[in-house]
Swiss-Prot record:
Cytochrome P450 monooxygenase; part of the gene cluster that mediates the biosynthesis of betaestacins. The bifunctional terpene synthase btcA converts isopentenyl diphosphate (IPP) and dimethylallyl diphosphate (DMAPP) into the sesterterpene betaestacin I. The C-terminal prenyltransferase (PT) domain of btcA catalyzes formation of GFPP, whereas the N-terminal terpene cyclase (TC) domain catalyzes the cyclization of GFPP into betaestacin I. The cytochrome P450 monooxygenase btcB is then responsible for the six-step oxidation of betaestacin I to yield betaestacin II. It comes from Neocamarosporium betae (Beet black rot fungus). InterPro entries: Cyt_P450, Cyt_P450_CS, Cyt_P450_E_grp-I, Cyt_P450_sf, Cytochrome_P450_monoxygenase. It is a single-pass membrane protein. This is Cytochrome P450 monooxygenase btcC. PANTHER family: CYTOCHROME P450 (PTHR24305), CYTOCHROME P450 MONOOXYGENASE ASQL-RELATED (PTHR24305:SF210). Pathway: Secondary metabolite biosynthesis; terpenoid biosynthesis.
Length: 510
């Protein structure tokens, strides 16, 4: 090693040691428990984040350190419903204390902030308010017809597969279903992936780049020099930038087509137009289109991935628990005699179906990590947290916790039933249902929650009415086989759907 190199190492090592000692002993978070290496460097978090087992790591840390865990030099994880309420409901621009979204996590490299990535509470409210009208009860009634038609396309495709005794990958069809619904609801034009039985380029781009997005989160946590170096290396080894550009290009094309030929049917794009800030329009409307493509991309992504994850995991869990599937068959097949009776309003009466959905959201939350916020200096769950600390409260640490749910690791829809239901079970009366918050809380709560519930109720009711289901292969806890790469990566879920004879199901008993 050259003399300058020796000088650099000799000088740099004490600096690193000094930083480590400071973070362990004198940092404002030094009193909070957690892995020592996590307190010293973000690299500990990045390693756990990228190995696909982050959710299981958090569960182990909670058992070891309790309900408040230091997972990075300046970051805490909380594991109580009270902390979740404190973190996620205080982000209103009218409040003195605001927990804003952590910019490095949500930051995007191009375009305008979206409903998902906007960190400023006032700007977020400006974006969200016009869009809320697009998710009103009257709008959802219009979207219901879209959901019904796409669900009918899906049952037709599954019936074709059954004629050849072919099992299908539920994950693939769930993604097509939710993608077709959200693209038509957004643009007023069908993508047709279900009817055609194959993915579009847009859907492939959307679902094929999850792991790279997780890497992006890890890179953005690094110091500037390291971040620049890693981005340079990653850009050469990965197609991420190219895929992202292709994805936005498709979004832009859809926006251009929508502007040229507005549909008569109700659609979210009308409300997206109302959110557009004043932008300088050049010859080709570039700034205007960049804004629109970003908002559309956020809506389509948000309405596809997590919704399809829930649908896939729900079907998987029902097949792993035949007694609960039998109860759902009993409810649906005695409520409807034909598929045309199934719509948004009629499915609201299916209490067991709703319980199945809520239990699926609990035992396998579509978002498997905590949404990071920046603390303004406030009490969280009875603990004072210094200003500038990044905080989060992952659902995963509460929904599978025996303090909040009886038999937390078991799939038991009965816990969500009202007392007057024939399958109600008193053992679940002490469950703290508020500990499950799959759509988050407060002003940042998922804007598409009602649409998602409508999709799940309608498509599941049609699938249960039309088919008997049989899984191919063994089943196990999805948490053990899935990998968390920002979103969930699950192995193929192969299912055989066989048309039923048309008789109402007999009572499965108590």
């Amino acid at each position: 090693m050259s003399f300058p190199g020796v000088i650099f190492v000799v000088s740099f090592f004490p600096l690193l040691m000094g930083i480590a000692v400071y973070r362990l002993l004198w940092h404002p978070l030094a009193s909070f428990k957690g892995p020592k290496l996590a307190a010293v460097t973000d690299w500990w978090f990045c390693k756990k984040w990228l190995n696909g087992r982050y959710h299981q790591t958090l569960e182990k840390l909670q058992l070891q350190y309790g309900d408040v865990i230091r997972i990075a030099p300046n970051e805490l994880v909380f594991a109580t419903p009270e902390a979740a309420r404190d973190i996620y409901t205080r982000c209103n621009p009218d409040q003195d204390l605001q927990f804003i979204k952590q910019p490095p996590f949500y930051k995007q490299s191009e375009g305008f902030p979206t409903l998902v990535t906007e960190t400023d509470p006032a700007a977020h409210r400006t974006l969200r308010k016009p869009l809320e009208r697009g998710f009103s009860p009257s709008s959802l009634k219009d979207y219901g017809r879209v959901i019904e038609r796409v669900a009918d396309d899906l049952t037709a495709q599954l019936e074709k597969a059954s004629e050849h005794s072919n099992a299908v990958d539920v994950k693939a069809w769930a993604a097509r279903f939710t993608f077709d619904v959200i693209t038509e609801v957004t643009f007023g034009k069908s993508s047709g992936t279900v009817a055609q039985g194959k993915n579009t380029v847009w859907l492939d781009l959307l679902t094929g780049n999850i792991a790279a997005a997780a890497v992006g989160v890890a890179i953005r946590r690094q110091p500037h020099a390291v971040k620049t170096l890693l981005r340079s290396i990653f850009a050469k080894l990965s197609k991420t930038a190219k895929l992202r550009a292709q994805y936005l290009s498709v979004c832009r094309k859809m926006c251009e087509e929508r502007l040229r030929d507005p549909p008569k049917a109700a659609n979210l794009f009308d409300h997206v137009l109302a959110t557009c800030p004043p932008v300088e329009k050049d010859a080709d409307n570039h700034g205007y289109l960049v804004f629109l493509q970003g908002q559309a991309a956020a809506l389509v992504s948000g309405g596809t991935e997590t919704s399809s994850t829930l649908l896939s995991s729900l079907i998987y869990n029902l097949l792993a628990h035949p007694a609960h599937l039998a109860r759902l068959q009993y409810e649906v097949r005695n409520a409807f005699s034909q598929s045309g009776e199934i719509d948004i309003e009629s499915t609201k009466q299916l209490k067991y179906l709703q319980a199945v959905i809520d239990e699926s959201l609990r035992i396998f939350p579509p978002v498997g990590f905590g949404l990071p916020r920046v603390c303004p200096g406030a009490m969280i769950g009875g603990v004072y947290v210094p200003k500038g600390t990044v905080v989060q409260a992952p659902d995963i640490l509460m929904v599978r916790n025996s303090r909040y749910f009886v038999r937390p690791y078991e799939f038991l829809p009965e816990r969500w039933l009202p007392k007057d239901h024939e399958f109600y079970d008193e053992q679940f009366s002490g469950d703290r249902k508020e500990a499950s918050k799959p759509f988050s809380l407060g002003p940042r709560q998922c804007i598409g929650m009602s649409l998602a519930y409508a999709e799940w109720r309608i498509v599941l009711a049609k699938l249960v009415l039309k088919f008997d289901w049989e899984i191919i292969g063994e089943t196990q806890d999805l948490m053990d086989v899935a990998r968390l790469k920002l979103l969930w990566e699950m192995p193929p879920i192969l299912v055989s759907f066989k048309p039923v004879g048309g008789l109402a199901a007999a009572s499965p008993g108590a």
